[in-house]
């Protein structure tokens, strides 16, 4: 098993999911008390939030925050599924620095939240020699598996479609570009766009591949200690 590159903070624990009642808040039962738990996942988390199931939560690192817990993972089938959407961005950098991202071989530095035009992309790789073209990467968290295929998105995503257009524009200018899909569950055998949820995104995704955008879909290795990076998933043959 891959060693974690991201470690959960001390004090993490399991709780029982009750409901999601706001976009960024879920209720859980912890030690007989109902507590509010922050979630940064704005997706639907389709099929993952079931009353009575176990979830994995971490204590807020800011003692002044109103919600004292953060949702890290859910366990609808007993196995951990990571739902914290800040993880892929962190993993991109840490996997690169650990030499576990072969697609970025030859590059020597990464800048996160790199500005491009009026927008920002999650990662910009450069090399000291200047011989390699810029490599722009946008990260996405994947929590949905359907018919053995890890799928993105789990809800309509105008922002995701915008990122695809931006990446295609950069590819047309001669830069290298990629999408890093971090699949925070282990029951998918391949990756593909969720055309049954956002057909426009799926259409743009394949156009992006034709335009030179690369797809890096990696499976997470999850434990209650933290998160590592596992195998690379092939693209589903369902185009």
Curated annotation (Swiss-Prot):
An MF annotation (GO) of this entry: DNA binding
Pfam annotation, one family: SfsA_N
Disulfide bonds: none
InterPro entries from the UniProt entry: SfsA (IPR005224), SfsA_C (IPR040452), SfsA_N (IPR041465)
NCBIfam families documented for this protein: sfsA
Family listed: Belongs to the SfsA family.
Protein name: Sugar fermentation stimulation protein homolog
Species for this entry: Maridesulfovibrio salexigens (strain ATCC 14822 / DSM 2638 / NCIMB 8403 / VKM B-1763)
Lineage summary: Bacteria, Pseudomonadati, Thermodesulfobacteriota, Desulfovibrionia, Desulfovibrionales
Gene, per the UniProt record: sfsA
């Amino acid at each position: 098993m891959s060693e974690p590159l991201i470690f959960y903070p001390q004090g993490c624990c399991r709780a029982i999911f009750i409901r999601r009642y706001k976009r960024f808040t879920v209720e859980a039962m912890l030690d007989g008390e109902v507590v509010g738990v922050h979630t940064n996942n704005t997706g639907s988390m389709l099929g993952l939030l079931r009353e009575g199931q176990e979830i994995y939560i971490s204590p807020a690192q800011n003692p002044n925050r109103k919600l004292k817990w953060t949702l890290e993972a859910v366990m609808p089938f007993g196995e951990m599924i990571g739902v914290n959407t800040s993880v892929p961005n962190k993993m991109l950098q840490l996997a690169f620095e650990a030499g576990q991202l072969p697609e970025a071989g030859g590059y020597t530095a990464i800048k996160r939240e790199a500005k491009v035009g009026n927008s920002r992309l999650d990662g910009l790789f450069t090399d000291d020699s200047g011989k390699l073209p810029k490599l722009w990467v946008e990260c996405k968290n994947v929590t949905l598996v359907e018919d053995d295929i890890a799928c993105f998105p789990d809800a309509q995503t105008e922002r995701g479609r915008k990122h695809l257009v931006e990446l295609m524009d950069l590819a047309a200018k001669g830069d290298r570009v990629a999408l890093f899909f971090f699949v925070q569950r282990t029951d998918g055998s391949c990756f593909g766009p969720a055309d049954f949820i956002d057909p426009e995104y799926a259409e743009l995704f394949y156009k992006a591949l034709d335009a030179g955008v690369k797809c890096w879909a990696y499976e997470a290795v999850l434990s209650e200690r933290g998160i590592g990076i596992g195998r690379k998933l092939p693209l589903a043959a369902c185009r």
